[in-house]
Each structure stands twice: as C-alpha cells, then as structure tokens.
C-alpha cells in the first residue's frame, strides 16, 4: 500500500480515502471549469470527494494556479514526512467510513453528492 498519493480530483480521491492512503488533491482545469468553480465555491467549499462528503478539509486541495510544482512537492513531502498530518487524514478517513457505513455505501455516497449539488443550485 502507498504511503501517500497525488490525486487528480475525481473518484480516485474517494478510493484513496477508502483504502486509507493519505493524499493531496490537485486539479488544473479549463477556463470554463475555473469559472464554474468560482461561481459555486462559496456554496460547496471543496472539490475533493472526501472533503465534500465530510464537509471538512481532510485532504489538502491545490486548484488551478495554486497547483504549482513547488506547492505540490511541498505538500507531498509533508504527507510523507509529517506523521501527524498523515494520521489526521487517516482519522478523517475513519469518520468517512463511519458516514458511508458497510452495506449501501454507493447509494449513500451518491445521496451525499446529490445533496451538495442541490445546495449549489439553491
């Protein structure tokens, strides 16, 4: 199992969390994606699925211009060397697993994601 991961925003962030792998979420999108995110970020606050589902900043997110090689390297290095930081993510993943539970995890995750989507339309 990996000690840390660098993930593009998407389902891989939830998969990494379920596997208990601390990770950094990075995404650089098109102009349209950036504009869309700017319009809804005050309503949702996060882009990574673990953060969205827990409504908390569990995994660091570097988006667009913040996703510089230096920042990515610094964050990944911190995940690998700072045991407290990695432990904090793993504790968050444990809360995520409690939220998602055992049977019906896909349905519950989808419902939470739909709740967030509905908030952005309100």
Predicted segments, located by residue:
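Nucleotide-activated sugar donor-binding and catalytic core shared by glycosyltransferases
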Residues: 1-122
């Amino acid at each position: 199992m990996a000690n840390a991961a660098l993930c593009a925003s998407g389902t891989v962030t939830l998969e990494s969390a379920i596997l208990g792998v601390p990770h950094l979420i990075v995404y650089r999108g098109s102009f349209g994606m950036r504009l869309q995110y700017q319009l809804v970020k005050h309503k949702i606050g996060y882009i990574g699925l673990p953060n969205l589902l827990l409504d908390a900043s569990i995994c660091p997110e570097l988006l667009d211009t913040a996703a510089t090689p230096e920042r990515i390297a610094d964050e990944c290095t911190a995940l690998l060397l700072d045991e407290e930081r990695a432990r904090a993510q793993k504790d968050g993943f444990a809360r995520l697993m409690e939220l998602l539970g055992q049977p019906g995890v896909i349905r519950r995750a989808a419902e939470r994601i739909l709740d967030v989507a509905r908030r952005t339309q309100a």
